[in-house]
């Protein structure tokens, strides 16, 4: 039977408590971020290089629009709550940020409304450079810049990407204490979790995302895939990359992973599990898989593994570490 969040919450709590009591080393060996921060503060404003290579200069922005929920949260963490005038729908749907009721919603993160953005007269817009789901953001660049609005692009997949964006945002707001409390301190806790919990036997793992239209497997380049890899798991898609495009239950049965992790996408978890049952679990051989037979077929919570966890990224690592060690003893 697929395990849920409640079944392992106690184990995670003990692990998190232990991690929070330890002063630790800086996070290392996690790869490079997806864009390079090159920033300089001067009397003429604050200048940095964004995710699409633009040299961006900002001058104490007072009207900021963010087109992703995770970016809105980062801006708020950086001390910019009072200057956030507009955001995307997922910010209020998926996150509890304590935003005022009258904040402007300028479309979804996939389909932002340029007219509504321009009507807010922003001096800075935070956009995503990821073209897989948010190519509409890149398409807004000319319109925004043509209106004299600074359009800054970011790419956040892994923790170090979050840390880079947070550093830029706290440089802009001048709130460097926030960079240390919601960035560096989290980095240190992650480093300790990895150091204390990495598995040496490299158990194999399958990571899946299920949604109303089907099922998609993920490799070690994804947010959760990277965390599993850092904790010592071997993602089966790293050896079978064709499964990224051609999801195959038969290949899963052939490889027989030690762990199967599932992330539900969308607003209906019941529908996600129904989709799993109809498209995966209905195979007669499914129940005989090592992961299923040993209760290592696990549903992961969306708040830690679908949405960017930002200032609680260490909780995502601790959650996985608790799962992996719970099954190992």
Regions found by a protein language model. Give the residues of each.
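Bacterial Sec-exported substrate-binding components of ABC uptake systems
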Residues: 2-17, 28-73, 176-207, 319-329
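Short helix-initiation/N-cap motifs at beta->coil->alpha
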Residues: 50-51, 104-115, 240-249
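Extracytoplasmic/secreted envelope proteins and their assembly/folding machinery
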Residues: 61-62, 68-73, 114, 118, ...
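A short, structured surface patch at a secondary-structure boundary
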Residues: 66-120, 124-134
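Short secondary-structure boundary segments
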Residues: 88, 129-130, 240, 263-267
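Alpha-helical, coiled-coil/dimerization segments enriched in small aliphatic residues
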Residues: 91-94, 216-245
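Extracytoplasmic ligand-binding site segments that recognize negatively charged/polar headgroups
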Residues: 93, 131-139, 154-168, 202-223
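Structured C-terminal subdomain patch of bacterial secreted/periplasmic proteins
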Residues: 161-174, 180, 262-329
């Amino acid at each position: 039977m697929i395990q849920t969040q409640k079944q392992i919450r106690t184990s995670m709590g003990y692990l998190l408590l232990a991690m929070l009591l330890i002063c630790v080393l800086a996070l290392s060996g996690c790869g490079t971020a997806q864009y390079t921060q090159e920033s300089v503060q001067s009397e003429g404003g604050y200048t940095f290089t964004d995710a699409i290579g633009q040299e961006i200069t900002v001058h104490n922005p007072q009207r900021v629009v963010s087109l992703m929920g995770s970016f809105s949260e980062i801006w708020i963490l950086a001390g910019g709550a009072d200057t956030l005038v507009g955001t995307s729908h997922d910010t209020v749907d998926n996150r509890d940020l304590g935003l005022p009721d009258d904040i402007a919603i300028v479309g979804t993160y996939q389909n932002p409304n340029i007219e509504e953005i321009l009507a807010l007269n922003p001096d800075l817009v935070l956009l995503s450079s990821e073209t897989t789901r948010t190519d509409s953001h890149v398409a807004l660049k000319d319109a925004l810049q043509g209106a004299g609005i600074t359009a800054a692009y970011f790419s956040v997949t892994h923790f170090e990407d979050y840390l880079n964006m947070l550093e830029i945002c706290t440089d802009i707001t001048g709130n460097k204490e926030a960079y240390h409390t919601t960035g560096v301190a989290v980095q240190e806790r992650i480093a300790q979790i990895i150091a204390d919990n990495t598995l040496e036997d490299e158990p194999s793992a399958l990571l899946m995302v299920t949604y109303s239209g089907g099922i998609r497997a993920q490799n070690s380049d994804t947010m959760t895939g990277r965390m599993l890899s850092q904790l010592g798991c071997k993602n089966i898609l790293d050896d079978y990359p064709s499964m990224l495009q051609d999801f195959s239950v038969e290949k899963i049965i052939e490889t027989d992973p030690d762990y199967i992790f599932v992330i539900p996408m969308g607003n209906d978890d019941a529908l996600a599990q129904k989709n799993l049952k109809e498209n995966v679990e209905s195979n007669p051989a499914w129940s005989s898989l090592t992961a299923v037979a040993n209760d290592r077929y696990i549903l992961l919570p969306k708040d830690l593994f679908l949405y960017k966890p930002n200032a609680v990224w260490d909780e995502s690592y601790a959650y996985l570490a608790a799962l992996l060690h719970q099954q190992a003893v």
